[in-house]
From Swiss-Prot:
Database matches in HAMAP family: UPF0301
Originating species: Methylocella silvestris (strain DSM 15510 / CIP 108128 / LMG 27833 / NCIMB 13906 / BL2)
Family the UniProt entry places it in: Belongs to the UPF0301 (AlgH) family.
InterPro entries for the chain: AlgH-like (IPR003774)
NCBIfam families reported for this sequence: PRK00228.1-4
GO cellular component assignments: cytosol
PANTHER family membership: UNCHARACTERIZED PROTEIN YQGE, UPF0301 PROTEIN YQGE
SUPFAM superfamilies, per the entry: VC0467-like
Protein name (Swiss-Prot/TrEMBL): UPF0301 protein Msil_1255
Length: 206
């Protein structure tokens, strides 16, 4: 998967693009990095696509530890973080730019020239300012932090979908922010009436 980010957020020709939807990996997914993955598609255009994997935890670091590593707070301030910050999950967002952080969050938070509203319930901010806001209790009501992202070059995602690598379904903020990581895959499929146990790699798109 490539590292090129679409510049326009996928807003050209709305009908052809899937930004704001979920991609669910099909059983025949040949790339183990994306097996049983659920991806929120942040941008999709003629130039390519960019998304965040929603169900892969970053096991070696917590949000509070990351704040210390980035000098947002001092180590002795971890115990005084607001409850909002303690709820932020840290995910492995994908194999591209794994040292870079991306915050998916509710639309009640916005930073000029930094926040990209994606749909009615989700925005993306990738600057340290949002981490500072969360640490102070001034951040969005709901948020997840992803390290890295999944990227596709021009036409690559479309080709993978034609090969039944992915199923696309409508996104739901409750699934993105609230659902337990271990159940997101099954929950995403159940939302469109698919029994995960009977899912075939020959199934077409939603």
């Amino acid at each position: 998967m490539g590292s090129r980010l679409p510049r326009d957020g996928g807003k050209q020709g709305h009908g052809a693009f899937l930004d704001g939807q979920l991609l669910v990996a099909m059983p025949g997914m040949s790339d183990n990095r994306f097996s049983r993955s659920v991806i929120y598609l942040c941008a999709h255009s003629e130039e390519g696509a960019m998304g965040i994997i929603l169900n892969r935890p970053a096991r070696k670091v917590t949000f509070s530890e990351l704040l210390v590593q980035l000098d947002v707070i001092k180590a002795d301030e971890m115990i005084r973080l607001p409850a909002q910050a303690e709820l932020v999950q840290v995910l492995k967002g994908g194999p591209v730019e794994t040292g870079r952080g991306f915050v998916l969050h509710s639309n009640d938070f916005f930073i000029d020239d930094s926040t990209l509203p994606i749909d009615a319930g989700v925005s993306l901010t990738a600057t340290i300012d949002i981490l500072r806001a969360i640490a102070k209790g001034d951040g969005p009501d709901r948020a997840i932090l992803a390290l890295g992202y999944a990227g596709w070059s021009a036409g690559q995602l479309e080709a993978e979908m034609q090969d039944n690598g992915w199923l696309n379904i409508p996104a739901d903020p409750s699934l993105i922010f609230d659902e337990a990581l271990g159940s997101k895959y099954e929950r995403a499929l159940q939302k469109i009436g698919i029994d995960p146990g009977r899912l075939s790699s020959d199934l077409g798109h939603a």
